[in-house]
Design a protein with these regions (language model features):
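Mid-domain alpha/beta scaffold segments of enzyme catalytic cores
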Residues: 1-258
Length: 258
């Protein structure tokens, strides 16, 4: 069985004391590849250092929407310089997007940065890893303004409804499913029943959103197994089928990790 964690921040300082054990537990659980989304200028160095130590870790480059503050143009410039000067090192542009959950102060700047980074993906032929929290209307407005026939990316840690998921899939996006699927969440379970496994990729978003039975604790990439197991129960298929089809979907979406 082979699993891919398509979204994990295991370069975070939370893992400094036991990163080798975290990696070992992941491989013991069948994880063959881990994708590392960037956050901002300060996360680049620890992310790249970790990716250099393990050949099955693949970094992305992007500016997270919650990192867009007064200095956002400088932050975006730093990220762009890294991406375009070393584009062969990155498997995707990410994570990028819209987040209006806590603060709407910089909504216009978030939309501008999201649009710019989407364009980088087109320019470099890279997929995108998109973060969205309470900003679906703004996200769709940006995507519409790009006026592209199709897109190549994933909506990570998807938290929308079935209509939004279907619209995104129609546009070319895959749906990232993480630990929330193991919570008592009938809405997400019904959504997963309605979506083909070929349109789903697995993720942990470690160290956040650990699945049951680790909810409330530090998440890690090895726990993607529990996410796959829950999806297999929801869809009434074997764990092996979930692993095979979501792994193939991830390899197709991110060709540089294949």
């Amino acid at each position: 069985m082979r699993l891919i964690d398509t979204h994990s921040h295991i370069y975070d300082a939370d893992f400094d004391s036991d990163i080798q054990e975290v990696i070992d537990r992941a491989t013991d659980n069948g994880v063959i590849k881990i994708l590392l989304p960037n956050v901002d200028s300060e996360s680049i160095k620890p992310m790249m250092n970790l990716a250099e130590k393990f050949d099955f870790l693949y970094p992305m480059m992007g500016l997270h929407p919650t990192s867009i503050k007064e200095d956002w143009e400088n932050e975006l410039s730093v990220v762009k310089n890294h991406l375009f000067s070393q584009s062969d090192k990155f498997c995707a542009v990410g994570e990028i997007g819209i987040d209006l959950y806590w603060d709407k102060t910089f909504v216009e700047e978030q939309m501008e940065a999201f649009k710019a980074q989407m364009m980088w993906g087109f320019d470099l032929g890279l997929p995108v890893s998109v973060h969205n929290r309470k900003g679906f209307d703004e996200m769709f407005a940006v995507l519409k303004s790009l006026n592209r026939p199709s897109y190549n990316g994933v909506l990570h840690c998807f938290g929308g409804d079935l209509r939004q998921a279907e619209k995104l899939i129609e546009m070319g996006f895959l749906i990232g499913i993480g630990g929330v699927v193991t919570f008592k969440n009938a809405h997400l379970a019904e959504l997963i029943k309605s979506i083909s496994l070929d349109k789903i990729v697995l993720e942990t978003d470690a160290p956040y959103l650990a699945p049951v039975p680790f909810r409330g604790k530090r998440n890690e990439s090895g726990y993607v197994l529990y996410i796959a197991e829950m999806i297999s129960r929801i869809k009434g298929v074997t764990l092996e089928e979930v692993a095979e089809r979501t792994t193939l979907a991830a390899l197709n979406l991110f060709p540089r990790i294949a």
